[in-house]
Amino acid sequence: MFGLHNHRGSCWVNAALQGLFSCPVLVDRYSEREEVDKENPVDVCLESIYRNQGTTGLREFFEVIKTTYLPAGENIGDSHELIVHLCDKLSWLDKAFRFETGDRIECGGCKVVQVEKTTAIDVNLVPSRAGIPLLDAIHEYVRPQTISDWKCDKCSHLGCTKQVLFGTFPKVLMFWSTTPIDYSSLLVLNGKKYFLFSVVCFNGGHWWTYARKLPPGHAWYVLDDMNVREMDSKKFPVDRTMRVLLYFLYEN
């Protein structure tokens, strides 16, 4: 665990990277320098930042990721959007995050069912109220919804039920929400165990991260730019300013 300097509001970059650097996928890759794609400047910069604990590579990283919506090194941005952007630029990271999903649509008239398949790298949760347990928020996410203005191509009936389905489960499961959710260190979905390794937070003007190394048993750390502090072993980082939760699949 190491700190990163804040350059003109780059706390959102720091929070995203400090969270990702606890991910086993990144740890394994950057522990073996020969795996780095020398033709990919994003990969090269991340490896430099990781191996040299932030003393090199950060300013170069700003330049290679900078866009109109990712003002790295110039202004505050969004940690979640940066993680999504990194998945777009790094195929191996995208592979770890991406999963198959789809919408099951059933006509309210003729009852014909169709499934529209796609893939995603995150789950955007919009819970019905603040502070509900993560599993309840997921249940709301996959609960069938009535769509009144949908028109059936077969019978022309107006109205259907739509339900989100998961086709596969990724190595890294990312949830994001602007509403506080009561999360836990262990999440079991469809018999699969996921362990929380990072919580990225935002209070309206500043980003920071809680992170731990895996497997479970390692201490949690607060990573706030250059301020890095180990938490008490009996404490769990529950924070109502959470925006991004990163879980890793435990495979026996």
Regions found by a protein language model. Give the residues of each.
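Conserved, well-structured core segments
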Residues: F2-H5, G9-G19, V84, I105-G108, ...
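Short, intrinsically disordered, charge-biased short linear motifs at domain edges
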Residues: M1, K89-R98, L134-Q145
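Residues immediately within or flanking Cys/His clusters that coordinate Zn2+
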Residues: R8, G102-R104, D149-C152
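Exposed substrate/partner-binding surface patches
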Residues: R33-E35, K117-N252
